[in-house]
């Protein structure tokens, strides 16, 4: 649970589950709670009501969310459910009939109404209501997620996100940039741009323009990245599909304006499986694009995720994926076994892959990727880079360069960090590496 100490007032416990997009939703709810004078507490027993922000992306996430709701009911008894699992109200009521209220994702007003019904907001205090301009954040002070859109226009057969969060709705570019400016003003040094499909940003608005800092800016990924670069902090892009217009970002990376880093959820490389998944692009086209990108920006770091054991996946399909990984030499990879989700079109596909085989393929893929990641990291030994410190303990520190995202990638372990502090940029020399992390010293 998230703990934020405030003045004496009605107390709300909060559980945030799921992806960074859901984390941003939690931050928005927490900010509104604090603005209205509620105290956010870290224990169930001291809360007047508990809000659980849930996930429903895969069955395991649904089970975790139901368990969290049950724990909150057992420990407190007064629970408001929100988030993606909130779209499955019948399931929640059947499993936990005692919940006070259920709302879907982004339904902030309904969450607040449910909290008000259980414990009305206190009289406002001009001093206890003060918050940083950027509101309540659940990340360390030096980095923050910047959500630029909601929903998705894709119809991937394994995914129900469009059912949960709707079609693509892009935030106006001036609002996104104003939020980014507030975050930087509050000490953020790294902006992690997120959405369900970052590369589709602005499609729904026909790339409408809005003014920021006296200059018209279009609601489009490249223009947004270019404007964010003016803030003088690291800008990292996540959830980017490899569309042709992504090519426009590479010069910004090569020039050092934004982090030379792309998080692309490719999911597979076999044309047959990609077609069954209804995913854009094929392995060969992506390989050619990666070659061009690295030619223009040699420091480019690529992260992706893949699904193995998708219905109908044969050993030949899996070999195509392994060959793609060898050729692409991606820096960081996550791999999941296929998990059926209620409402997903893939549930109707023939030839399900036995769980044992899917798990074997996952292990084989990750073993291969460990070798690839080790080779990629070894090439950085002997170089110097700027590291953003996440934690400091005496002489030792842990941080990341522009080539490592928080929470999902490896880290850089440093010596010689006396007097340094989290959130500080330091120059470092890299001296060793393994398949996940780098090791070095502060210069």
Swiss-Prot record:
Q: Where is the Radical SAM core domain?
A: 138-375
Instruction: Using the record's annotation, list all stretches that form the TRAM domain.
Output: 378-443
- Domain spans labelled MTTase N-terminal: 10-120
Cofactors demanded by this protein = [4Fe-4S] cluster
Q: What reaction(s) does this enzyme catalyze?
A: L-aspartate(89)-[ribosomal protein uS12]-hydrogen + (sulfur carrier)-SH + AH2 + 2 S-adenosyl-L-methionine = 3-methylsulfanyl-L-aspartate(89)-[ribosomal protein uS12]-hydrogen + (sulfur carrier)-H + 5'-deoxyadenosine + L-methionine + A + S-adenosyl-L-homocysteine + 2 H(+)
| Binding positions ([4Fe-4S] cluster 2) | 152, 156, 159
* Pfam families (alphabetical): Radical_SAM, TRAM_2, UPF0004
The subcellular localization recorded is: Cytoplasm
One GO cellular component term of this record is: cytosol
EC number of this enzyme: 2.8.4.4
A Gene Ontology annotation in the biological process aspect, one of them, is: tRNA modification
Q: Which InterPro entries match?
A: Elp3/MiaA/NifB-like_rSAM (IPR006638), Methylthiotransferase (IPR005839), Methylthiotransferase_CS (IPR020612), Methylthiotransferase_N (IPR013848), Methylthiotransferase_N_sf (IPR038135), NA-bd_OB-fold (IPR012340), Ribosomal_uS12_MeSTrfase_RimO (IPR005840), rSAM (IPR007197)
The protein's matches in CDD domains, at most eight in alphabetical order, are given as:
Radical_SAM
Keyword Transferase part of the UniProt annotation: yes
First-level EC class? transferase
Entry keyword set: 4Fe-4S, Cytoplasm, Iron, Iron-sulfur, Metal-binding, S-adenosyl-L-methionine, Transferase
Predominant place of localization: cytoplasm
* Residues engaged in binding [4Fe-4S] cluster 1: 19, 55, 84
Q: Which HAMAP family match?
A: MTTase_RimO
Tell me its family. Belongs to the methylthiotransferase family. RimO subfamily.
Job description of the protein: Catalyzes the methylthiolation of an aspartic acid residue of ribosomal protein uS12.
Q: What is this protein called?
A: Ribosomal protein uS12 methylthiotransferase RimO
Gene name in the database record: rimO
């Amino acid at each position: 649970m998230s703990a934020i100490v405030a003045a004496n007032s009605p107390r709300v416990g909060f559980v945030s589950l799921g992806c960074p997009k859901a984390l941003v939703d939690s931050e928005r709810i927490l900010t509104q709670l604090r603005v209205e004078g509620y105290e956010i507490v870290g224990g169930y027993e001291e809360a007047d009501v508990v809000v659980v922000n849930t996930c429903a992306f895969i069955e395991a996430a649904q089970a975790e969310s139901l368990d969290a709701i049950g724990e909150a009911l057992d420990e407190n008894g007064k629970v408001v459910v929100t988030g993606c699992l909130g779209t499955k109200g019948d399931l929640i009521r059947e499993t936990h009939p005692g919940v006070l209220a259920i709302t879907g994702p982004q339904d902030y007003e309904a969450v607040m109404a449910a909290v008000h019904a259980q414990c009305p907001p206190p009289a406002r205090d001009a001093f206890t209501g003060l918050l940083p301009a950027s509101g309540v954040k659940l990340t360390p002070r030096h980095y923050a997620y910047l959500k630029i859109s909601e929903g998705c226009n894709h119809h991937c057969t394994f995914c129900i996100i469009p059912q949960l969060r709707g079609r693509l709705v892009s935030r106006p570019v001036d609002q996104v940039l104003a939020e980014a400016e507030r975050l930087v003003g509050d000490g953020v040094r790294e902006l992690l741009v997120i959405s369900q499909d970052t590369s589709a940003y602005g499609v729904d608005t026909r790339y409408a323009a809005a003014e920021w800092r006296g200059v018209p800016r279009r609601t489009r990924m490249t223009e947004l990245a270019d404007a964010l670069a003016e803030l003088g902090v690291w800008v990292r892009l996540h959830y980017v599909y490899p569309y042709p217009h992504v090519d426009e970002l590479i010069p910004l990376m090569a020039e050092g304006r934004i982090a030379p880093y792309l998080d692309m959820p490719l999911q597979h490389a076999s044309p047959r499986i990609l077609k069954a998944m209804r995913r854009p692009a094929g392995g060969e086209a992506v390989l050619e694009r990666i070659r061009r990108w690295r030619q223009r920006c040699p420091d480019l770091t690529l992260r992706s995720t893949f699904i193995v054991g998708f219905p109908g996946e044969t050993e030949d399909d899996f070999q195509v994926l392994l060959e793609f990984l060898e050729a692409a030499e991606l820096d960081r990879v996550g791999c999941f076994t296929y998990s059926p989700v209620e409402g997903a079109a893939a549930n109707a596909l023939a030839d399900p892959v036995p769980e044992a085989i899917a798990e074997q393929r996952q292990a084989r893929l990750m073993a291969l990727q460990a070798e690839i990641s080790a080779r990629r990291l070894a090439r950085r030994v002997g170089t110097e880079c700027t590291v953003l410190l996440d934690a400091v303990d005496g002489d030792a520190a842990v941080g990341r360069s522009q080539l490592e995202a928080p929470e999902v990638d490896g880290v850089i372990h440093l010596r010689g960090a006396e007097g340094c502090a989290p959130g500080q940029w330091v120059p470092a020399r890299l001296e060793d590496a393994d398949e996940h992390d780098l090791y070095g010293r502060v210069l």
